[in-house]
Amino acid sequence: MAGSQRLKRMADSVQRELSELIRQELKDPRLGGLVTISAVKVSADMGYAEVYVTVMGRELGDEQSEAANKETLDVLNKASGFLRHELSRRIKTRITPRLRFHYDKTNAYGNYMFGLIEKAVQDLPEQSSEDKS
């Protein structure tokens, strides 16, 4: 039980510090948009951290957005060594996990589903108050 709390604290620290590092230190123009870290999962041995990111302003299914998201992941994965080094300076632990970035489609998928629901509701025929009784 104590180990899971430790992993959660480590994941929270990594998420907080990485968010700041990406915002302040990475100046690559290919990042484009606001990169947000939605979740971090640290392995039990703290050797790896799976970092899930979203990029605000990109819709699900758009081919151009998919290519831009892939490019963002490439930039982040190539900068993972630098980010890990900077992370080790900010978080004082014996082991700093290796970073692996993944695109988190949850937010974009939620927006997509919300749009479908709104469209379905608009397409419903309007019922008068007499029809409801």
Curated annotation (Swiss-Prot):
Superkingdom in the source lineage: Bacteria
InterPro entries to which the protein is assigned, alphabetical: KH_dom-like_a/b (IPR015946), RbfA (IPR000238), RbfA_dom_sf (IPR023799)
Keywords for this protein: Cytoplasm, Ribosome biogenesis
One of the record's GO cellular component terms: cytosol
GO biological process, one term: maturation of SSU-rRNA
Main location as per UniProt: cytoplasm
SUPFAM superfamilies noted in UniProt: Ribosome-binding factor A, RbfA
Localization annotation: Cytoplasm
Disulfide bond sites: none
Alphabetized GO MF terms: ribosomal small subunit binding
PANTHER family xref list: RIBOSOME-BINDING FACTOR A, CHLOROPLASTIC-RELATED
General function of this protein: One of several proteins that assist in the late maturation steps of the functional core of the 30S ribosomal subunit. Associates with free 30S ribosomal subunits (but not with 30S subunits that are part of 70S ribosomes or polysomes). Required for efficient processing of 16S rRNA. May interact with the 5'-terminal helix region of 16S rRNA.
Subunit structure: Monomer. Binds 30S ribosomal subunits, but not 50S ribosomal subunits or 70S ribosomes.
Family classification: Belongs to the RbfA family.
Protein name: Ribosome-binding factor A
Organism: Acinetobacter baylyi (strain ATCC 33305 / BD413 / ADP1)
Gene name as annotated: rbfA
